[in-house]
Amino acid sequence: MVAYLNIHTAYDLLNSSLKIEDAVRLAVSENVDALAITDTNVLYGFPKFYDACIANNIKPIFGMTIYVTNGLNTVETVVLAKNNDGLKDLYQLSSEIKMNSMENVSFELLQQFSSNLIIIFKNVADEHRDIVQVFDSHEDTYLDHQSVLVQGIKHVWIQNVCYQTRQDADTISALAAIRDNAKLDLIHDQEDFGAHFLTEKEIKQLDINQEYLTQVDVIAQKCNAELKYHQSLLPQYQTPNDESAKKYLWRVLVTQLKKLELNYDVYLERLKYEYKVITNMGFEDYFLIVSDLIHYAKTNDVMVGPGRGSSAGSLVSYLLGITTIDPIKFNLLFERFLNPERVTMPDIDIDFEDTRRERVIQYVQEKYGELHVSGIVTFGHLLARAVARDVGRIMGFDEVTLNEISSLIPHKLGITLDEAYQIDDFKKFVHRNHRHERWFSICKKLEGLPRHTSTHAAGIIINDHPLYEYAPLTKGDTGLLTQWTMTEAERIGLLKIDFLGLRNLSIIHQILIQVKKDLGINIDIEKIPFDDQKVFELLSQGDTTGIFQLESDGVRSVLKKLKPEHFEDIVAVTSLYRPGPMEEIPTYITRRHDPSKVQYLHPHLEPILKNTYGVIIYQEQIMQIASTFANFSYGEADILRRAMSKKNRAVLESERQHFIEGAKQNGYHEDISKQIFDLILKFADYGFPRAHAVSYSKIAYIMSFLKVHYPNYFYANILSNVIGSEKKTAQMIEEAKKQGITILPPNINESHWFYKPSQEGIYLSIGTIKGVGYQSVKVIVDERYQNGKFKDFFDFARRIPKRVKTRKLLEALILVGAFDAFGKTRSTLLQAIDQVLDGDLNIEQDGFLFDILTPKQMYEDKEELPDALISQYEKEYLGFYVSQHPVDKKFVAKQYLTIFKLSNAQNYKPILVQFDKVKQIRTKNGQNMAFVTLNDGIETLDGVIFPNQFKKYEELLSHNDLFIVSGKFDHRKQQRQLIINEIQTLATFEEQKLAFAKQIIIRNKSQIDMFEEMIKATKENANDVVLSFYDETIKQMTTLGYINQKDSMFNNFIQSFNPSDIRLI
């Protein structure tokens, strides 16, 4: 038997460039019979290695390279599993090494696991004899062919393999440089390490002792371990009084069913069916385990989502409290979740509020034991963009070149270097010089290799035995991880549950806590009305910022057109707004507003598709159609649905015949049967699981309900979740203002790190202030809790420690208004900073001694800072304006001129702004132009003034004034900007608008009677302007008459209206 006993795969991270599939391919081409995977200290690659070997008729041998020490010397050692007990020993040995961050293994530890292992010591020298001789009585101890002779121990030929061919030796140097954050020496780091996959011809050319080769065959024959997939490894649930899980589960379910006010007989029938399926499959422990951890969460102040995925289709899940979705009420199918005709582990994913998810994981660890619970490893790979930068960095490319590389590779998920090479600019870069070509060659060899490990975001493995009995473990950032990925661990048979952290649940929970604390209202989200018209009005207006699943611009647009009237509309929207089914949205909306346009291919489709107006939206509908027409069981229907989504032609043709035959036997004509099959085939590609849609729509509805009825609390918590994002915070602040919510400046006696809702409005977070860190906020808030609110600015300065009380902090707090409640102007407080920072006030002492030993602090009252300066400081320190910005204030007064904000302006429409910055530059042709920053009082935008316009408006730009600008919107470096075509002062624009208006549109006729004499029925001369009334209730414009612009009362007429009720066109 020809065997390689020392293969290091790419899962020996950054030590080998040999992919498992390449090792197996080479083995096949060189007639190798067996391969041993021997990565250093880890077993990451075992499942992939085993599958690849079995698929190619190669014998897989499981092993590991370790470094054995006696405290003085260390020897490289390969250990191979002889059997499945040896495989388990490898699991535990690797787990011990990785969990304890060992670099070397003591010979005593190796002895504990040696009985079912073959041990091969490598490169043994005289100083290693003491270690080796400890194992001389071990039946299967060997030395490699390069070791010294040790009496009684046989030698074996063993070839270290880390890369494919001699030409790939540079990959090892490159990987080492990436690992060590070093530079790659392209001249001296290109030695051949002698670790490539030897060809049959190369082996024959070696002068190898035949006895050594014989031992290779002996060892390969002795190694007969195999991975066991699909084991039954479900942990047993500890029931009270050791009652069987089956009996206990039934007792709990019936007890709960009796508590609910439901149609008992209907629900009992469904319950009996589900219970039978679950117990026949042996999953009763699974449901009890999941129910237990959710019960812990709910009784320990951790919010749990209503359901996720198809599990909401289970009545058992509903009765156990795993979900809060009644599957019968919402017409959900159990078989979509658990199919009795396709036995697979049920998959219940659980959403917890993200800030308290760890509590539940900790509970599971305490209940089952630390070694019985783990997270799951994932691997980061050297994909195109990452490998390009990594190799560029180790080759000494400067930052400019590295950025050029990044810009040349498109931001496309899964893009390869070969795909990037098809782009001309990237190809030119590669062939710019020999160094770049060498860079590309190394990148290509390393592309796709695993680079590092990380933790799966949600998966938790649970077992009632130590997990290392079934899979190797390693240490992650926050606990243990399996060394195998999620799919590999599940394939072994281990129970995996996804504990997902959902930010929106944290927001909901915080709102409920605060409303109860502040208002004394205990909101039970399971009892809120799901037909609240105010909620549907909110959704119909597209006012869904901060609403789970509904806040994208596209969904808002759909909601405005659809105008939801009931919960099912929300379920439909969340299901339709995805690639594929989006094309059905116009049909759905049209039919929803005019049911007469609904058409069915066959009348028997109506009961199934009535709620979705004839449009197939849900996977469950496909299953129901198959059941109705072809008499499929729901289990068979689920298999059909899966086959359709996978597009396997052979399977699809078989299912087509199955469906048509079933339909014929059920009394349907063959033609209609084929049409129905084609219909569901079309939608199967993107049908959405209704159970998941209902569950997530429930979260969306709850958030909408809270937004409608407790807006201050809603926005405060949404804002608290975007701390750190200046752009999102500014957007949310602006929306809250539009909703009539008062945004209060940070208040030193009220504010926290998070935003604080109150009945008056929302206090800004102290943490929002630039230059004020979390620790400073914590000190301030802790002092306030311990010793009461601050009496004034001087009291604050005395009580806050010197290490926190810096000029920078005090200025920031003053300039955003944190001390405004003390009744002193911000300029007065700025003047007082020197007093509080002098020597006496920096002495931290108790208040009594301070009052005696220090002179009374006095304010020197100053006039308040100008509004423009206050706004400027707020923008500087907060990223947005709290007080009304002068531009925004002027906009409110002058909106009758039909002017726009940056956010809603279109090309060439007049926009009121100030210029925050004007940067003049000279073009290559020697002409002047400018880049400017426009500010409309709410947001800022970059603008460009090209030479012709700059020459025209250069003098205007030197004025500190408010301007009306217009131009064309464009994108530069993926950022929106305005190419400015025209600039006027506001005063000039207003004068011209009044002089040349063609029409006046009013929205309120209450002032008309006062000016009745001015209004003429017909146009008499060129100075007459049309006066129109726009009735918003019926969306209709009517002409009231004409007004002469030259009339002395014309301006009085204009000014008599609220600026929001009149427009000059």
Curated annotation (Swiss-Prot):
It is found in: Cytoplasm. Its EC number is 2.7.7.7. Belongs to the DNA polymerase type-C family. DnaE subfamily. Signal peptide: none annotated. It comes from the Bacteria. NCBIfam families: polc. DNA polymerase III is a complex, multichain enzyme responsible for most of the replicative synthesis in bacteria. This DNA polymerase also exhibits 3' to 5' exonuclease activity. The alpha chain is the DNA polymerase. The keyword Nucleotidyltransferase applies. DNA polymerase III contains a core (composed of alpha, epsilon and theta chains) that associates with a tau subunit. This core dimerizes to form the PolIII' complex. PolIII' associates with the gamma complex (composed of gamma, delta, delta', psi and chi chains) and with the beta chain to form the complete DNA polymerase III complex. GO terms for biological process: DNA replication. One of its GO terms (molecular function) is DNA-directed DNA polymerase activity. This is DNA polymerase III subunit alpha. InterPro entries: DNA_pol3_alpha_NTPase_dom, DNA_pol3_alpha_thumb_dom, DNA_pol3_finger, DnaE2/DnaE/PolC, DNAPol_HHH, NA-bd_OB_tRNA, PHP_dom, Pol/His_phosphatase_N. It comes from Staphylococcus aureus (strain Mu50 / ATCC 700699). The keyword Transmembrane does not apply. It catalyses: DNA(n) + a 2'-deoxyribonucleoside 5'-triphosphate = DNA(n+1) + diphosphate. GO terms for cellular component: cytoplasm. Keywords: Cytoplasm, DNA replication, DNA-directed DNA polymerase, Nucleotidyltransferase, Transferase. Pfam families: DNA_pol3_alpha, DNA_pol3_finger, HHH_6, PHP, tRNA_anti-codon.
